[in-house]
Each structure stands twice: as structure tokens, then as C-alpha cells.
Amino acid sequence: MLQVTDLAMTFSKVLITGLGQLGLAAAKYVKERGFDTYGYDINTEAMEIAHRSAGIKPVADFGSHEFDVYVICVSTHKPDDIFSPQIDGILSTADKISREAKKDGALVSIESTIPKGTSKKVFQLLNHRLHVVHAPHRWYALEEKEHGVNQLRVIGGVYNCCIRAGMQFYTDTKGNEDKRERDILVSSTILIATWGSLCIQYRT
């Protein structure tokens, strides 16, 4: 378990897990923001497409690099019923991260839509060796120009240290200041920034 101290995290290497429509869009955006961006998918063809179309570096082993951030974009509904949640892929990914991640204190951000209680299950699998946030996407394939990756969104963190890590990542640009707004509104419980983020501590 992490010893919670004042966070001063540096994010460089980001791994996007799940390279479908959402994951590929997220990977492209993360790369555009200046991060060293990698991708993983159980479908090797998806990794090849991400590499060819966007230069996303494919990986099979989460321990092959010392990743600072794991962004989970795997599907969370049954293949034949989009209204029935299925979190096996999320938990399998979390288990793989738990077994293979080299860096204690890295950030795990779940961007997939998940049912209540899922973040807590992921957090327990990781035993707070890594920070966990839920930053549900608002990306819409049919209107990507208006509803792309960079939108105001809500972030929930299991602990305050998780929220701080999530906020730092989602407002980091690796020096590309033109890619985000500078203004950040802070209150005792709510933080607003871009890619953009409205952050509330909660335990799901």
C-alpha cells in the first residue's frame, strides 16, 4: 500500500489499454499532448492499426516499460446487449496491471463507463500500490468534432491522493500549453480543469 505523502508526480510514459474506437481516439490525443504513448489490446490487429495510423507503440507486457499512467478504455457491456454491464475486461486488465506494473504510485485511470462499485474492486486488486481514478469519457463517434476526447468531464478518486494524481495528469501537457486552457477553479471539494475535469472524491 502507498504511503500517502504530498504528491509531486511526473508523467511521461502512458499506456492505453483497449484500442477500439474510444481507446484509439484517446491514444491519439494523449500522443498529441506530448506524452510517450503506448497501446495494448487483446486484439493484435487493433494494436497494428494504432501503430500504423497514429504511431502508438504496441506492448504485450505491462512490465516492459516503467509506465506512469494506465488509461483503461476496454468495453464494459455484453457484446449482444449494450445495456447489460460486463466488467470482466476491466478486472482482467486491473489484474494484469497488478501483476506486471513496475512503478509503485503510478496512476490507473478508468475511462470506460462502469457500474457502481467497479472502481473500488480495481482499487482492491491493486492494493493501493497505484492510484485509481474514474474519468468516464464523453466521446461520441458520430460527432467527434463536437464531442471528442477533450471535454469537460467528472473524475472520481478513491482517496484524495488519487484525485490529486488524476488532476495532475489531466491538466498536464508536457509543455504544450496551447493545447489546454490555463484557468483552474478550485474549491474544497470540486476542481475544474481541462481535458477538462470536474473532480469529486467518491468511492465506487
Where would I find each of the regions flagged by the language model?
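Short, glycine/charged-enriched secondary-structure capping and boundary segments
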Residues: 29-32, 52-55, 84-88, 122-126, ...
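N-terminal Rossmann-like NAD(P) cofactor-binding module of classical short-chain dehydrogenase/reductase
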Residues: 70-71
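Short, charged/polar "capping" segments at the starts of alpha-helices
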Residues: 44-49, 116-118, 161-165
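Internal alpha-helical scaffold of NAD(P)-dependent oxidoreductase catalytic cores
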Residues: 2-6, 100, 125-133, 139-204
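A short, aliphatic-rich alpha-helical micro-motif
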Residues: 62-67
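Rossmann-like NAD(P)(H) cofactor-binding subdomain of soluble oxidoreductases
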Residues: 78-143
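Conserved NAD(P)H cofactor-binding loop of Rossmann-fold oxidoreductase domains
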Residues: 74-75
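NAD(P)+-binding Rossmann beta1-loop-alpha1 motif at the extreme N-terminus of oxidoreductases
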Residues: 2-60
